[in-house]
Regions:
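Structured secondary-structure scaffolds
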Residues: 468, 479-482
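Conserved short loop/turn motifs at secondary-structure junctions
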Residues: 213-221, 467-474, 497-505, 536-539
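Conserved thiamine diphosphate
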Residues: 271-281, 456-472
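Active-site-adjacent structural elements in folded domains
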Residues: 262-266, 436-454
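A glycine-rich, hydrophobic/aromatic-adjacent loop/helix-cap motif
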Residues: 209, 235, 460, 482, ...
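Generic structural marker for isolated residues within well-ordered, non-membrane alpha-helices
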Residues: 228, 465, 514
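Conserved alpha/beta enzyme-core scaffolds, especially Rossmann-like or related mixed alpha/beta domains
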Residues: 151, 178, 182-183, 443-450, ...
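N-terminal export/assembly segments and adjacent metallocofactor-ligating motifs
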Residues: 2-355, 359-434, 475, 553-596, ...
């Protein structure tokens, strides 16, 4: 056989491989003789730490826990020898780390032999480094210099408890703060009387003085967050905040508002094992998101057997493209434009799930075998001169029932057969495009209206597909091809998004546009579609028969304290006494003294 180009003369490929094998074996033998030296590669302060000491060796303790290196919360298996954490592995009992996972009934003495790999990603493996990091904070720190100076001292837990409880001149040692008094829990609580005094007499709707306590934490587990919240509410403060505002609030608001806030659902995910086509918008699967290794494992399995195609829509390429069918390098912040362009094309081409969208209520959906319904057929007031312009038309406004009727505020739809308007609850199907096509409108009791579906089309029609493509930084052909493929798999296509989309000033609106793509297919809660998770642990014992019913403990305050959060989240400025007072005095209530975030939480 001729030598490959560039190979030294006289050496065949077979000969090279034979020689390399012998040489490799010699290196192994030589290395074995130097094994004491090799061991020194794996050491900690001069003590041997065998990197792969079998967990069944005498003296090795194995503890099962959960990884906190990221928010995936994968199960871990910690191997400890001589009081030193030697190695972290995946927990064979945990579904994030092992698939299929071992049953809890399996004896830990033999679970190491469980056939399915129980893996842990490199970041999880680095948990050992975190444990022994010399800069790891293990005690409370107290500021010793001006704010922002970075000057701290370590204090004991007992000192922390005393100072936050009793208060006082806690920073008398800091220049400029010698006489600053800091209230402690005891002073703020005032024997429980502060719960009955207004924190702002001019604005009593701001709540009691106990709202002066603000509890804010970063990332906390659900159980930890439950107890922190429970303590704050028992104390009498509404100001209890998790980390959401610096995490992905835009994503959660977009999801909740798209689902009408139902059940507090802030997260849906594609049913990867059963889906046929997934659009990942700004979601760095296989490298990030959570649970990262679980998503990656399922994604690789689904693409390996060729039943799943997926597209990465992202400003950068990454490991997710190794198995992707396509990468769409979108302009930063252009995700919403891409989604709107797809919506426009889908409606123009009538490639939406009309039967699903026509179901106007839960009973109609159930009768049709649908797990949910949409408001696509509900009439929306589109009269700029009407005081409720942009709101859903109500039965009383339509002249269908008296204003005193229990159904006065019920939404209104158009019967597709007769063209008559009726309450949404009184029909099994309603018209998406009543009388005048996709862009038309109708008058009901003198009020100009369109269906929600028509309003969606009117908004998307503000731009052409070419214009949306320019805003997104892609070609019009890309939008058309994505929309065509997306609507070619029935309910087994999903559009999902995360931080790459939502961490922009237009993040909520872009996220809602992507949610609409799923609604046009009617894929929510369908096999292969967009689904909810399985829930979480019952940390406070809310389930009947729970051994520790902490949520119903006798004599504890069970209600959320009154008032407006200091972050102004979850509250409407227009409903505040300050707004109403300005109106009564003939003053403009705008601009508000501070920004309010009625749809936000955890800010």
């Amino acid at each position: 056989m001729a030598n490959p180009q560039g190979s030294p003369p006289g050496i065949s490929r077979r000969g090279f491989l034979r020689g390399a094998t012998v040489l490799g074996g010699g290196v192994v033998v030589a290395g074995w003789g130097l094994s004491p030296w090799i061991g020194n590669v794996f050491h900690r302060r001069g003590t041997f730490v065998y990197p792969d000491r079998p967990p069944m060796w005498p003296g090795v303790d194995t503890t099962y826990s959960v990884c906190k290196q990221c928010h995936s919360d994968c199960g871990i298996e910690a191997h400890v020898f001589g009081g030193v954490l030697e190695k972290l592995d995946g927990n064979p009992y945990h579904p994030n780390a092992t698939e299929p996972h071992a049953p809890y009934s399996l004896d830990p003495a033999v679970v190491a032999l469980w056939p399915a790999p129980h893996s842990l990603c490199p970041r999880g493996q680095a948990g050992r480094q975190t444990v022994y990091d010399p800069y790891r904070i293990t005690v409370p720190l107290k500021r010793t210099g001006p704010r922002g100076s970075g000057q701290w001292e370590a204090i004991s837990w007992s000192m922390l408890i005393k100072e936050v409880t009793e208060g006082g001149h806690l920073f008398a040692h800091v220049k400029g703060e010698e006489h600053r008094h800091v209230s402690g829990f005891r002073e703020l609580w005032d024997g429980g009387q502060a719960r009955f005094r207004s924190i702002d007499p001019a604005n009593p709707d701001f709540g009691p003085e106990t709202n002066g306590l603000v509890i804010y934490w970063g990332r906390a587990e659900a159980g930890q967050a439950d107890f922190l919240t429970r303590f704050g509410h028992a104390f009498g403060t509404i100001n209890v905040f998790p980390h959401v505002g610096i995490c992905d609030l835009n994503h959660h608001v977009a999801t909740q508002e798209s689902l009408n806030g139902m059940g507090g659902v802030a997260m849906l995910k594609p049913d990867i094992p059963n889906a046929e086509y997934i659009l990942w918008f700004g979601e760095n699967v296989t490298e990030a998101n959570f649970p990262m290794q679980t998503l990656g494992r399922k994604l690789v399995a689904a693409t390996t057997d060729n039943h799943l195609k997926y597209v990465m829509i992202d400003v950068r390429t990454g490991n997710g493209n190794l198995h992707a069918n396509r990468w769409v390098p979108i302009a930063p912040g252009g995700d919403g434009a891409l989604a709107m362009g797809m919506i426009r094309w889908i409606i123009d081409q009538d490639r939406y799930n009309g039967e699903y969208l026509a179901r106007p209520n839960a009973h109609a959906a159930q009768a049709a075998g649908e797990p949910n319904f949409s408001n696509a057929t509900w009439l929306v007031i589109t009269d700029p001169g009407h005081p409720h312009d942009g709101a859903f038309l109500e039965a009383a406004e339509a002249g269908l029932v008296p204003t005193s009727a229990s159904t006065a505020k019920e939404p209104v739809v158009v019967d597709p057969g007769s063209g008559q308007v009726m309450p949404a609850s009184q029909t099994q199907a309603a018209a998406l495009w009543p009388q005048h096509g996709k862009s038309g409108s109708i008058k009901v009791n003198g009020i100009v209206c369109q269906t929600a579906m028509q309003r969606l089309y009117t908004e998307t029609s503000r731009n052409t597909v070419d214009e949306y493509a320019k805003l997104a930084g892609v070609s019009a052909a890309v939008i058309v091809s994505l929309a065509h493929e997306f609507t070619s798999h029935g309910r087994k296509a999903v559009a999902d998004f995360y931080r790459g989309v939502s961490q922009h000033t237009n993040g909520v609106l872009a996220g809602r546009a992507i949610m609409v793509l799923n609604f046009l297919l009617g894929n929510v809660d369908w096999t292969g579609g967009y689904i909810m998770g399985g829930g979480a642990g019952d940390y406070l014992g809310k389930t009947p028969g729970a051994p520790y019913p902490l949520d119903t403990w006798p004599n504890q305050p069970a209600h959320i304290p009154s008032g407006v959060p200091i972050s102004r989240e979850g509250a409407f400025y227009e409903k505040s006494l300050a707004y109403q007072a300005a109106q009564k005095e003939g003053r403009s209530p705008f601009p508000a003294p501070r920004p309010w975030f009625p749809f936000g939480f955890g800010i």
